[in-house]
Amino acid sequence: MSILFYVMFLPYLCGIHATNMDKRNLPENSMNSLFIKLIQADLLKNKISKQTVDTKENHQSTIPKPQILLDLDGDDNMKQDFQPVISLEAELVKQQKQRRYKSPRVLLSDSLPLEPPPLYLMDDYIGHSTVVNNRTSRRKRFAEHKGHRGEYSVCDSESLWVTDKMNAIDIRGHQVTVLGEIKTGNSPVKQYFYETRCKEARPVKNGCRGIDDKHWNSQCKTSQTYVRALTSENNKMVGWRWIRIDTSCVCALSRKIGRS
């Protein structure tokens, strides 16, 4: 734009200075020299401005852009099957305040549990505590079991706290690693699982107790259900997942061939 202005202004400037040059006997190329100097000054100014802009753009391009974090909670399937954990210590405090999805069969504690969860009976519990064989304890156990006299279970089961669970199958069918010892604060915390399983497949000779063996084949089988636990997959992606654990003993029946 400046060069165009100089080109348009040149004839006017030449007309004004023509008379003066005649009177003062100025050299003929004085106007050309003036015009060339003005153009050079303008070009130099534009070049400096352009270099300044390029320098700013290059500096901005070298600044690293912030990494985009993926929102795992945005995917509904991922949110249901896997919930990532950033800080284990903060997550433990959060679990103490929130009881949603919390199963009594999963315990996070710094010491070995000596009793079953409050919601489960102690009839079939085989814990690590010693039993004191005295008259008071026998009377207490008799009073607790008094209401169960005359009742029999089709299958015999046993329940215990599993303290060394290392692997499990999650709700997607993938094998995951169960976090054993979790380092937080002063003392480490471990995960304990209260599991129930069958003592034996056939409590009686022909299968389950109380089943008509003339018409039915029966067998006691351990059943599983899903609980939430802190796990990792391929030594990464630590978070809460639904995993299968043993929770009951049921009697499986099948009709004998040739029987109606």
Swiss-Prot record:
Its main location: secreted. GO terms for biological process: cell surface receptor protein tyrosine kinase signaling pathway; modulation of chemical synaptic transmission; negative regulation of neuron apoptotic process; nerve development; nerve growth factor signaling pathway; neuron projection morphogenesis. Pfam families: NGF, NTF3_N. PANTHER family: NERVE GROWTH FACTOR NGF -RELATED (PTHR11589), NEUROTROPHIN-3 (PTHR11589:SF4). This is Neurotrophin-3. The keyword Secreted applies. The gene is ntf3. The keyword Transmembrane helix does not apply. Residues 19-141 form a propeptide. Keywords: Cleavage on pair of basic residues, Disulfide bond, Glycoprotein, Growth factor, Secreted, Signal. One of its GO terms (molecular function) is growth factor activity. Glycans are attached at N134. SUPFAM superfamilies: Cystine-knot cytokines. Seems to promote the survival of visceral and proprioceptive sensory neurons. Residues 1-18 form the signal peptide. Belongs to the NGF-beta family.
